[in-house]
Amino acid sequence: MSRRKQAKPQHFQSDPEVASLPRRDGDTEKGQPSRPTKSKDAHVCGRCCAEFFELSDLLLHKKNCTKNQLVLIVNENPASPPETFSPSPPPDNPDEQMNDTVNKTDQVDCSDLSEHNGLDREESMEVEAPVANKSGSGTSSGSHSSTAPSSSSSSSSSSGGGGSSSTGTSAITTSLPQLGDLTTLGNFSVINSNVIIENLQSTKVAVAQFSQEARCGGASGGKLAVPALMEQLLALQQQQIHQLQLIEQIRHQILLLASQNADLPTSSSPSQGTLRTSANPLSTLSSHLSQQLAAAAGLAQSLASQSASISGVKQLPPIQLPQSSSGNTIIPSNSGSSPNMNILAAAVTTPSSEKVASSAGASHVSNPAVSSSSSPAFAISSLLSPASNPLLPQQASANSVFPSPLPNIGTTAEDLNSLSALAQQRKSKPPNVTAFEAKSTSDEAFFKHKCRFCAKVFGSDSALQIHLRSHTGERPFKCNICGNRFSTKGNLKVHFQRHKEKYPHIQMNPYPVPEHLDNIPTSTGIPYGMSIPPEKPVTSWLDTKPVLPTLTTSVGLPLPPTLPSLIPFIKTEEPAPIPISHSATSPPGSVKSDSGGPESATRNLGGLPEEAEGSTLPPSGGKSEESGMVTNSVPTASSSVLSSPAADCGPAGSATTFTNPLLPLMSEQFKAKFPFGGLLDSAQASETSKLQQLVENIDKKATDPNECIICHRVLSCQSALKMHYRTHTGERPFKCKICGRAFTTKGNLKTHYSVHRAMPPLRVQHSCPICQKKFTNAVVLQQHIRMHMGGQIPNTPVPDSYSESMESDTGSFDEKNFDDLDNFSDENMEDCPEGSIPDTPKSADASQDSLSSSPLPLEMSSIAALENQMKMINAGLAEQLQASLKSVENGSIEGDVLTNDSSSVGGDMESQSAGSPAISESTSSMQALSPSNSTQEFHKSPSIEEKPQRAVPSEFANGLSPTPVNGGALDLTSSHAEKIIKEDSLGILFPFRDRGKFKNTACDICGKTFACQSALDIHYRSHTKERPFICTVCNRGFSTKGNLKQHMLTHQMRDLPSQLFEPSSNLGPNQNSAVIPANSLSSLIKTEVNGFVHVSPQDSKDTPTSHVPSGPLSSSATSPVLLPALPRRTPKQHYCNTCGKTFSSSSALQIHERTHTGEKPFACTICGRAFTTKGNLKVHMGTHMWNSTPARRGRRLSVDGPMTFLGGNPVKFPEMFQKDLAARSGSGDPSSFWNQYAAALSNGLAMKANEISVIQNGGIPPIPGSLGSGNSSPVSGLTGNLERLQNSEPNAPLAGLEKMASSENGTNFRFTRFVEDSKEIVTS
């Protein structure tokens, strides 16, 4: 046993300046062995044993050194050779004897720190307890010190030795003095040192700390009060007990690890090699802890020895803590009772402790000097019954600091002991600087709560302890439901709220659960610290017991049929394939089925929360996962259905619920293990109580059928709910057939298809080289020429009244196909190949066509590229076509452009009524009739089998076959064809086409379908770029009246003309004025919509009247259009007075000026936020649209402030949302920007806060109320059936458009509102 000896100085009560050095020299002359290193140069202080290599440093130190300092000598050289230790003669007086005892005790205690052997590596700790009694003289004290290394010494026996320990330990017990026996401590000076063992608040261990209070108190030289000394002694004993408990837990962990690594059953006597190989880092740390704890215990026993030498030999009863009840209890517990030291020493000989002690020291029997000095930590293991039994919950007094012993070893060694820091200090300092220099006050504050790893400083020890877990990886708090671990209790509280819905009867475990208990199997199969069986077994268990073998793998999640898309997502995380039953759920690729999917989804969603609340599903233990980590497959807010281990549950195909009768029993078992009922009241008042109440309220209230069961978000409808589920699953069912990209919604797919679509240039009219028919879409023209070449269309010029239904058909086919995706199952779209459409039987009457899906040529974006493609036609047709296209490029539009286009509506109507009388009104022109329908050959009934030939969509007909199957037209698009698709398969894909689902509200150019004709009319202006509504202030044009009205609000009142607020009845309809009457304005709208009137500034002078349709239109439709030559954009003539920027309009300048003034006139009527522009407000309003109707989603939102109409007439505006009608009718915000128009807006109704200017969905309920005249003449678009529209209902599309032309009293306004759907403005 290597010991590092230091020359022992003798203390004199005389003047320290005179007596200390001679005494030290005298000791050296008496023949005491000196230290092995630098014995001649070292100068040792006679009071504190501090050594100095310079005499001047020693003299300087003695000025500040006080008597009776306790010195902790840190082991710096564990490999030093052992030396003999000769005792010095006893001192002459009793005071010297007392001081001599203290010094000897310190020397023995410090020498114990230098022991590095196998016993230390096995977490053993030597606590030498030298005792001085009254009858023992100085000789007995000296002999005790001299025989300390021997195996038969009394100190070795008292420290819990092995088999060679002597049994007579009761004679050498350490007793604590009573209060009355400390009166003789008058000469005992206060301990004044940098290092002191003090009782720290909120800690459970003895910590060597720099204490400013102790140093300041010691500087005054005052005497230590007896109560304070007793308090320190009692606190020291209590802390020592907690340290021994810590070592017991460390020993248990090492034995467990050793048994696991060696694949041997856990034995009580593991070999030294096994411990070295399995727990090498733990052995090093435990050795370090053993030294430090031995020093702490040695100090405690040295204090007790001093008290015992003064008070006498009489046996003292055990001293209890002041707050604890008095008694003669022996077994220490976590409650804090301080046992007597002699009981701890005598407990070594008990049979229960001898077994553990002998097992710990079995590998050291060969060393006679060590065999009898086993660790007292093992000796006290029998006394620490609560800590040694891992089945019992650890009380908060012990486990709040050491909740999990394995990661906390480094924390304790690095943070809670200053001895290692002192050792590092001494090693880093120069030899002439003492290691015990006092630090400054600021340094002490930093040193007290400073992280040893990253040097971060914290304000409290608890914050430091939590921070240290980030270094050690300790997660002491365990969720008793899913088994996840957390570093703090607050994180566990937040996490546990996610389980409240599924497990409302299970309470959270607020106590730390040691991590090593996770690997210990139990008889019930439920791991320690958990209330229910884990949903997947832990792979690191010693014996893999099945978890609840009564539960089979047939138990699964209660997934409703609305969540079939979650099944493949869950399957991807399963290690083994699991057969999924499709009896209760839809196919994995299908989200919506044709047979009442939403209804069944509603029922399942409605019934799910009650099932989830009443009967919670236990997990199946039939399979295991490779990793032991608990992973979240979906957001954990959905713990009611998809909690974190949901990826490993049973087959998701079984939609049955299972009531687990064991859950109440498991909850009671958990309560028995963790008696924390009193803590739940405080948890209710925590920061998570509001969240918990919110979750409970959600459980209690009636669930919305459109509520997401994962995040509890309420959607507007079932389709929106299904699209929302894709955000959780990551599913993208809608794939582009051209490029393969997938999208979550069909709207995104349709938006994406615009990338592939070849849009014609602005105002380009393509003329057929055969019949001179005009088309605005090049793809439509190609199909038209194909029909010419196939003989389906006569190669003679058609009259003006010829049907233009082909253009309607082919143009609307572009994107009607994707609008129809709502009406067929997504399974069909998923299962079919990406580059094709499933083949279906073809009609015998319909002409065959070849469709293939290939990438669309980029050359289709220009007319020049179209010319190159059309060179494949024969020479004669190619010359005519090229000449026509070149003329179009040069801008020389032929004279019959307007006539041909404007006659399209009438001709369309005549052709359909004459050629297909069997066609119902509901199918009209949306049936994509070919020009050959006048022969009545194909149209017997609107059945799918007898569908006429359809046009080629630009998405699918990217490569038309150059050799059609049945004599079709030439290939005008691509020279390569891929997969041949039969044309009538589209009839199967779009089954609602012949059922009147789509009326004549499809755009002939881009194929979009709208809910009403007025929306289609407004949409056509996006293609023609017509802006018929002109602002009289800045001459800007707008496509809709609503946009013009919104724009007018940007002008100040002084800018508005005075005639704006007066009736304009004095203006004649034929007057060529800048003021356009309402009747001529409506005529302009109709003729533009029906005939694509393109009035350019240069043509408006030569063309005072436009060509009107030849069909039976109303008289107002033939009224002249008097539109002056107004420029589209004026030069920049508006200047900002602040920064000098120029703008082309006053509205742009006004918006710009708001950046200088900070004005935000556009306020949100929902949340009150204000914005500088209406566009920003529109974007913001999208954040409030999550619970709106489907028509509101993804559409253009027109946000108007609560302004009233400019005039005194009652106004009825369109309202898209029925649920907002009652709340928003008549509402006005007086604090908004519109107050400046109070004079003009005093009379009339308030405008609604939200309106859709472009309606793209059907199913809009009509607003109740008077619609005015019920027999007004509507106007149809290009595809309109005029006869049907004339006999339509008053609430039919565009039913009130004529009200603007002929109002009841003949009073017209320039700001007459454009009518949308069945809502109108009644002007009087």
From Swiss-Prot:
Zinc finger (C2H2-type): 43-65, 449-471, 477-499, 706-728, 734-756, 766-788, 1001-1023, 1029-1051, 1134-1156, 1162-1184
Intrachain disulfide bonds: none
Gene3D superfamilies: Classic Zinc Finger
Principal place of residence: nucleus
Comp. bias intervals (Polar residues): 321-336, 802-811, 899-936, 1105-1119
Record field: compositional bias (Low complexity): 135-158, 633-646, 843-856
Stretches with biased composition (Basic and acidic residues): 22-42, 113-124, 937-949
Cellular location(s): Nucleus
SUPFAM superfamilies according to UniProt: beta-beta-alpha zinc fingers
Signal peptide interval: none
Cellular component terms per the entry's GO annotation: chromocenter; cytoplasm; heterochromatin; nucleoplasm; nucleus
UniProt cross-link Glycyl lysine isopeptide (Lys-Gly) (interchain with G-Cter in SUMO2), position: K439, K673, K690, K701, K947, K982, K1086, K1219, K1299, K1319
Any Pfam family the entry gives: zf-met
InterPro entries xrefs: Sal_C2H2-zinc-finger, Znf_C2H2_sf, Znf_C2H2_type
Subunit structure as annotated in this protein's UniProt entry: May associate with NuRD histone deacetylase complex (HDAC). Interacts with components of HDAC complex including HDAC1, HDAC2, RBBP4, RBPP7, MTA1 and MTA2. Interacts with CCNQ. Interacts with NSD2 (via PHD-type zinc fingers 1, 2 and 3).
Known role: Transcriptional repressor involved in organogenesis. Plays an essential role in ureteric bud invasion during kidney development.
Similarity remark: Belongs to the sal C2H2-type zinc-finger protein family.
This protein's name: Sal-like protein 1
Source organism of this protein record: Homo sapiens
